[in-house]
């Protein structure tokens, strides 16, 4: 069983436990009634539709490949730093076992900042989409390799009904076709293989031509330098998601400024 398989299986267990506390029907009703006073519908994808490269900056305490990244996880302070430095969106890890994330991190960050937040988790059930809306998320991550074609299409429709965005993540040619057929409006290429966690930043370049120009294209993971940013700009990406590089920077604002201006 790969790490990704384990993450997906643990997500199913988490959802089963959450449903014991709040049923699917209940979470649906709460989500439908939840209004974001600071953001418009589909604020996440609108934030990525600008002439210049957009930056999605990640708040994460740990990862399966790197272990503990930020022992003193000042998540609200980090989120404020990102927003002050010009981040367009914030990605918040909520997976608790391998990433040491928490729903509370997302809930509090979404209340604190004025830019859209995406719930970074391993979505395997529609329940998690409704849950994300109640936590203040403007978007959710949908990973093709842990979903069927039918699930992906249904989950995108649920997002649309709630006014939130779906960042559909792919890693290869087959998943690119799957995402396009499902009607994804935002497609992210993960440069990290979630089955073995190896990184190849050339993956974004390799898959770029398979994504129509009217779909927002995001390059995810492995971005460390201004050279990486220039390469991403060259392939016509609309946005980049940066995690560990910013989390390990002593001065996150200075590091983001450096990357944004490259």
Predicted regions and their residues:
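C-terminal helical cap(s) of enzyme catalytic domains, especially alpha/beta-barrels
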Residues: 206-210, 233, 248-262
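Conserved, mostly hydrophobic/aromatic
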Residues: 7, 57, 82, 132, ...
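An N-cap/entry alpha-helix motif that binds or orients negatively charged groups
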Residues: 2-70
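Active-site beta-loop-alpha junctions enriched in small/polar residues
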Residues: 10, 60-62, 95, 122, ...
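N-terminal active-site wall of soluble small-molecule enzyme domains
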Residues: 59, 66-167, 173-179, 204-207
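Catalytic cores of alpha/beta
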Residues: 124-135, 173-182, 219, 223-242
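Glycine-rich phosphate-binding active-site loops on the catalytic face of alpha/beta enzymes
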Residues: 131-150, 188-197, 237-255
